[in-house]
């Protein structure tokens, strides 16, 4: 841990952060230029239409391969750019169920408490006034890799999945965070489509929100389902087996259940709706636009006024956002909406980072 702490200090001391009003620093290499250019695709789209944005996920590797300072230098420039665009950001990720080998884990749980990874020095930097910064606290969406996972076999709470305890949120607040994104699964919160929500799972979600709020954190609830709902017979997909009306009704129930729960700043309609099908809409993009509009309308019908985050088909990626959604598509009577994009800097934008910084740089130079 001493080596990690030393690296954090060195990296923090060497970053040159542009203050508001200053010109952005020029990219020093091709990978920095590529990442910043991709982010500007999304922020340019927002600017063109007067829309507001939220980066629900951004993540990069730790120093396990000895290149943490290079990744952090890119990250610092990326956050400068996000600050100038006044983007809300939750970095990916932390959570007590992550193993110590997960290279995007921002805070390791070492058995005695949480320990910052090398990325934390960038993520913890102060945001401009009125801009929310924080992290995703994963765990509520875990346990879905087993072939048997479904609405009928959702896993065991505390073993296969769980929300982090209040101590995690208190620690994050002490580190300067003000926002957390809480993923959860549709199959657990609503074990049968069109049926009431599960009161036990609702209670767990409310308890997690209460723990975050007690620490002074605001919460974005994140339905982490990729545009599908798992059953023993296979996935049901939005646009095909699941109608926009069914999806909207789920969000009506969620908004009714949570609208009096303090601490929630917004609702994330669907994490990376990549499994959405075209159906009668003609294209999966249009099917998602119709489903997400129906969900926003349903949420507002309950009297809920809080923010709604709307991702883009298929992976909510910044670099190709306009090619899937040339224009904003949501009409919100409350005008309290942010379009949610994600950004990973490896060449396939998967966030798996199998290559080193130097390898990714070489790939960027060949573009």
Question: What residues fall within each predicted segment?
Answer:
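Secretory targeting and sorting signals
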Residues: 1-18
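N-terminal carbohydrate-binding accessory modules
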Residues: 15-21, 25-28, 34-45, 109-179
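Extracellular glycoside hydrolase catalytic/binding regions
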Residues: 22-85, 107-108, 153, 157, ...
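Hydrophobic beta-strand scaffold residues
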Residues: 53, 89, 219-221
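Solvent-exposed loop/turn segments at secondary-structure junctions
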Residues: 59-63, 94-99, 138-143, 179, ...
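Aromatic-rich peripheral "rim/lid" segments of glycoside hydrolase catalytic domains that contact
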Residues: 64-130
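Short acidic/polar active-site loop segments enriched in Thr and Asp
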Residues: 87, 133, 178-180, 265, ...
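An active-site-proximal structural segment forming one wall of the substrate-binding cleft
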Residues: 153, 157-179, 184, 190, ...
